[in-house]
C-alpha cells in the first residue's frame, strides 16, 4: 500500500491536501463563526456558471469560477441586506442562477466538456504542479492576512455591530473575506468539487469546535483535523477505487461523529467521578 507514495501524482495529492487544510482552516473558521456556511454553499454552486462560460468562450474555467463565486458572494451579501429579502432566499436565488447559467453554457459549448465531472465532484489525484503553485500562493497570503489582522477578523466574525461601534472597517474586511472565500472555494474545486467543497469549510471546524472555544484554537485544530480527513479520504479512495472527493467528505463526517462520541464518553466519566467524590 505504501508503494503508492512513490508516485508523483500521489505526492501532489498529499501536498494539495496539506495546503487545502491550512487554507480551509482559516477561512472555514470565519465561515462557521459568522454562520456563512449556507452562503458558502451558494457561492460554490454559483461558480458553476463561470465553469460553463469558460468552456463556451474558451477561457480558463477556474478563472470563470472565481469570478462567479466572488460576484455570487457579493450578490448574496447585497440581497441579504435588503429588508424585503430573506438571507436564505438570496442564497437560493444566486445558487440556482449560477448553476443554471453553467448548465446552459456547458450544453451550448462545442463538443463534450469531458472534465465537467471533475469540477462537480473533484479529483484530488488530478492536481497539477501549477495548481499547487497557485494554491500555495493563496494559502501563504491567507495565513498572513488572518494572523496579521486576527483581532479585527475575530471581532467582525463574532459581532460585526460591536466592531462598527469600535470604528473598525467592517465593510472592507467583509468584502476582503468574501474575496478570500471565493478564491478558497475555487482553489479546492480540484479536490472535492463544486458540490462538496463547502464541507471542507465546515466539518473540520465543527470537529475542532467540540474541544476548543477560541477562534485561534479552532483554526489550529481544524488544520490537523482537515489534513487527517484528506489523508483518510485519499487512502480510502485508493483502496476502494472510488472518487476521492466523496471519500474525503465521508471520512470527515465519520471522524466528526467519532470525536463527538469520545467527548460524550469523557464527559460522562468525568461527571461520574465527580459524583462519586461527592
Locations of regions flagged by a protein language model:
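Membrane-interfacial amphipathic/re-entrant helices at transmembrane-helix boundaries
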Residues: 1-22, 270
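Transmembrane helix-bundle core of multi-pass membrane transporters
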Residues: 7-12, 83, 87, 91-151, ...
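Hydrophobic alpha-helical transmembrane segments
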Residues: 14-19, 62-67, 92-93, 132-137, ...
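Generic alpha-helical transmembrane segments of integral inner-membrane proteins
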Residues: 18, 22-26, 67-75, 101, ...
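Short loop segments and helix-boundary regions at transmembrane helix junctions
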Residues: 29-112, 208-220, 237-240, 264-265
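Helix-loop-helix "hairpin" substructures at the membrane interface of multi-pass membrane proteins
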Residues: 131-204
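Transmembrane alpha-helical segments in multi-pass inner-membrane proteins
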Residues: 191, 195-246
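Cytosolic-side transmembrane-helix boundaries in multi-pass membrane proteins
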Residues: 242-278
